[in-house]
Amino acid sequence: MPMYQVKPYHGGSAPLRVELPTCMYRLPNVHSKTTSPATDAGHVQEPSEPSLRALESRQDDILKRLYELKAAVDGLSKMIHTPDADLDVTNILQADEPTTLTTNALDLNSVLGKDYGALKDIVINANPASPPLSLLVLHRLLCERYRVLSTVHTHSSVKNVPENLLKCFGEQARKQSRHEYQLGFTLIWKNVPKTQMKFSVQTMCPIEGEGNIARFLFSLFGQKHNAVHLTLIDSWVDIAMFQLREGSSKEKAAVFRSMNSALGKSPWLVGNELTVADVVLWSVLQQTGGSSGAAPTNVQRWLKSCENLAPFSTALQLLK
């Protein structure tokens, strides 16, 4: 018998029903249509500011330009790797901005460095068996821009140098003291496999190859080009040195086709101004005999335009 008797708290014989919770806290359904919107809408993205939209527009323009430049470089690469393809590189991309040329002489200190009053002397070693005509043309052009002290020497490695090569700079009578010149240009006829250049014997390695030296010398004119024109100019210089000078007859024919196409659209290879591409290609054509009557019509016209300029006609006399 129990000590205490307690009445059951549920009704008689009815089953016990206990509602157990399924979550710790109950919240209203946020997806319900009847639910009022949240008062704190700080997490909602605000409309973009005008400055942000302008930045996005600039980004789109830059990306579009990069894609166009990539297409131009890919096209030039295709022409170099497949020299038999008749590819018109001038139509790959037209420059949005015209080529601008500086009319004032470039500050040589910005390119050659400061020598604290010493004359900046460019020294070139060249083989008389293959005179670098492009460098002689550029020398004459430099003389029109700067006061250049020009000298010619002969190295002991060569025995006989033609008289016209010894006088390739003309009669050099020094009328001024050395420190009054802006630039020194020393040419040494030497038995070297490739043309070499130095302008600071103590601090730099030599630049080798006629094309590379021509690029450097032409940079002293301060000529400015956009990225597309610079790519085309470098491509033409490489084509001259590797395909036109050392390539097969098939490669040379492809170069003539590309030149003829480019010169049909502009008086010079890249635009309306003379560039280092014209100088180097003209030099290689003269050295390899490619300037004969077999050249296409536009190339023949371009050759005459080059030879009408005094620096080209003077250099051409060295081959006679």
UniProtKB/Swiss-Prot annotation:
Gene Ontology molecular-function annotations: molecular adaptor activity
Keyword Flavoprotein: no
Protein name per UniProt: Aminoacyl tRNA synthase complex-interacting multifunctional protein 2
GO biological process: apoptotic process; negative regulation of cell population proliferation; positive regulation of neuron apoptotic process; positive regulation of protein ubiquitination; protein ubiquitination; protein-containing complex assembly; translation; type II pneumocyte differentiation
Region (Interaction with PRKN): 82-162
Organism field: Rattus norvegicus (Rat)
Region (Interaction with TP53) residue spans: 162-225
Phosphoserine found at: 36
Function: Required for assembly and stability of the aminoacyl-tRNA synthase complex. Mediates ubiquitination and degradation of FUBP1, a transcriptional activator of MYC, leading to MYC down-regulation which is required for aveolar type II cell differentiation. Blocks MDM2-mediated ubiquitination and degradation of p53/TP53. Functions as a proapoptotic factor.
